[in-house]
Amino acid sequence: MNITRILSQELSATTVQINAAIELLDDGATVPFIARYRKEATGGLDDTQLRQLAERLQYLRELEERKAVVLKSIEEQGKLSDDLRAQIEAADNKTALEDLYLPYKPKRRTKAQIAHEHGLQPLADVLLAEQPQDVEAAAQGYLNENIPDAKAALDGARAILMEQFAEDAELIGTLRDKLWNEAEIHTQVVEGKETEGEKFSDYFDRREPVRAMPSHRALAVLRGRNEGVLNIALKYQPDDTPITQQSEYEQIIARRFKVSDGHKWLRDTVRLTWRAKIFLSLELEALNRLKEAADTDAITVFARNLKDLLLAAPAGRLTTLGLDPGYRNGVKCAVVDDTGKLLDTVIVYLHQENNMLATLSRLIKQHGVKLIAIGNGTASRETDKIAGELVRGMPESSLHKIVVSEAGASIYSASELAAREFPDLDVSLRGAVSIARRLQDPLAELVKIDPKSIGVGQYQHDVNQSRLAKSLDAVVEDCVNAVGVDANTASAPLLARISGLNQTLAQNIVAYRDENGAFDSRKKLLKVPRLGEKTFEQAAGFLRINGGKEPLDASAVHPEAYPVVAKMLAQQGITAAELIGNRERVKQIKASDFTDERFGLPTILDILSELEKPGRDPRGAFQTASFAEGIHEISDLQVGMILEGVVSNVANFGAFVDIGVHQDGLVHISALSNKFVQDPREVVKAGDVVKVKVLEVDAARKRIALTMRLDDEPGGAKHKMPSENRSRERTAGRKPQRNDRAPTNSAMADAFAKLKR
């Protein structure tokens, strides 16, 4: 198996690109470094392609290692033929490899092995090859002290044949593909669980093709099964099929081993093999495959949403008051300055409104607060209302209030990191600090929190947690390096995400900075303990030194490329300070004049872009949503209302929008636009501010159906999805006929409602 060629085909890249990327990865280079500073070597592979390459490379190398183990095992048994070796070496996935290994894999003594030891292999061979009608007569010649009668002999022969049938790799592959492509997954409510499992009512009696089941439905029904509410079964033929009727799968097995239609004993053996052995194994395998595919989709959704939140526009360096709302325990308040340094804290109470207004007004005036960040949890709307009174009562202060997600703030508050950062601050007040800081700079603050706690994932608790963690770590790393960090102000958790660095090196940088003062150049980073040349190469381009000796240190230009900039300056006859940020002078430089064997055109163009806008931030402009006054709870909503909200989560089937009622509403993919939408992310992303219309409210089930097509009328003629979306929905799943109707957005809201633990 040629790994390079396989990766080349999968990524639509040349073998030269693939080999270069593999060499860099094997040499310890990080994905952000390769994507940014080694474009010539990889032909411009981006971070997404490099992540895919790294993941597939690991899989294929594990496959090769497993092949070596399998070949050695079979060879030691003396059963490795040239043909089998060729099949094993040609296997392109782990499932196919294990199918080939199954007949030779060491296993506990089976009925077939015992029968073989008792001399029944020849009987099994005769029964299959000659297919005598009188099988009992054929068995008489194989009786011995271990086989007292014909029945025992035939039972042993059957065990041998069943194992032989079930371990035929080519046959199993055929049956597996057929089952996956044609079988339906049938979900039914467990008797007596109708009330307890009401949130799974969409799946109380549902059938749809297993291969077409969307990830959100797959994870929903699997959660229902895990909670003891749903039974799940794979159906390969109609329920009313007579039990004696031979299935297509049994016919395939019979044809494979040339079993005649009239031989009842062999036909029964085939039926038992399929129903008691092969199907049970393939059903479990299919459900695992469904789970893995659903995990992949859900993790992809979570990763994209996390990226959108991490790269949300920062409000900027403004003194901010963070409010962590609460009823009984009060509203926790924290003021941080424009650098995020804690200035003041206090706890106020909603039922003491006048005192709360006076206290917050004092804090705002005393510290020059410009922004109020309000957590969106319990008591958020009441807190927001009082903050609104403050803003209106202080027009001269240029004060603005913004409701922000407080997901993960409580987890951060109780973390070891928060304890080190604020050892003398009450745990309850640390969350208010986090809320204030995440408004100033979401990326810098959210990196301190386990990404799984940020709450932008589709069924994040149901998917494979190690795969999820690996994917999210990659997203955080890519986001931090895309923005870059100030080496003199960044926290250790933020520095730890920089290419080439880890927690230890990040702590060393902070410790060196605290002891020796601010870094005045990137070169000074080499004085940090354990930060060597290799690490410096990987990290330097992503670390900024503002106001240092070298102007380029504040840019994304890598130190290795400084000589190139020096040549540009010499050609133009100007200094770095005169060139950096001077768009007209940068435009006069011809990129091709500075290419050489080491630095190609892609790198030179990147350098020029950076010189034009040094340290440019890829994050967009800051914007906020204004929640409607008087809309606090789901019971306040009325069908037809047009509201402003914030996209909290984007899934494959639509987008969830926070409209300020403590329960996100769903805009189904069909209601995102008047045009056909293939992927919701073509229209929205997490953090976007959108206008929506309320189409349906189910307060009992906490479900809200919304549309971004503001001319839609609930239940009206306009309230239909584009024809392409209707077609896609019909092919995506099928319910029993009594439930089969043209879906509306409200029906889809029911079908795809967000399930929370």
Swiss-Prot record:
Keywords: RNA-binding. The keyword RNA-binding applies. GO terms for biological process: nucleobase-containing compound metabolic process; translation. CDD domains: S1_Tex (cd05685). GO terms for cellular component: cytosol. Residues 640-709 form the S1 motif domain. SMART domains: S1, YqgFc. It comes from the Bacteria. InterPro entries: HHH_9 (IPR041692), NA-bd_OB-fold (IPR012340), Ribos_protein_bS1-like (IPR050437), RNaseH-like_sf (IPR012337), RuvA_2-like (IPR010994), S1_domain (IPR003029), S1_Tex (IPR044146), Tex-like_central_region (IPR055179). One of its GO terms (molecular function) is mRNA binding. Residues 710-757 are annotated as: Disordered. It holds the Pfam family HHH_9. Residues 710-741 have a biased composition (Basic and acidic residues). The keyword Phosphoprotein does not apply. This is Transcriptional accessory protein Tex. The lineage of its organism: Bacteria, Pseudomonadati, Pseudomonadota, Betaproteobacteria, Neisseriales.
